[in-house]
Amino acid sequence: MLSVTQRGDAIVFSVRVQPRASRNTIGGEWQGALKVYLTAPPVEDRANESLRRLLAEHLEIPVAAVRILSGGRSRIKRVEVRGTTAQRIRELA
């Protein structure tokens, strides 16, 4: 089950990123984290920006409401989103 934490008016959860995938998509849950496939390479923050855009698109929130808290150089990241609910995050998985 996806581990989602409420922190004030924000939701924090883990994401497992697979860069250089064939398409940008959300692939369910992986060991408590949201599994995300991105076409962008993990170079010059391209994958991180692609992740922010993909999550914002699926959650129908502005890209500015999605922030990577930790793991900027790792496949496993902690992400904070504002303007949505924990239930909505769980539905992505």
Where do the model's predicted regions map?
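Contiguous, often N-terminal, cationic amphipathic patches that form binding interfaces
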Residues: 1-52, 58-63, 67-73, 77-93
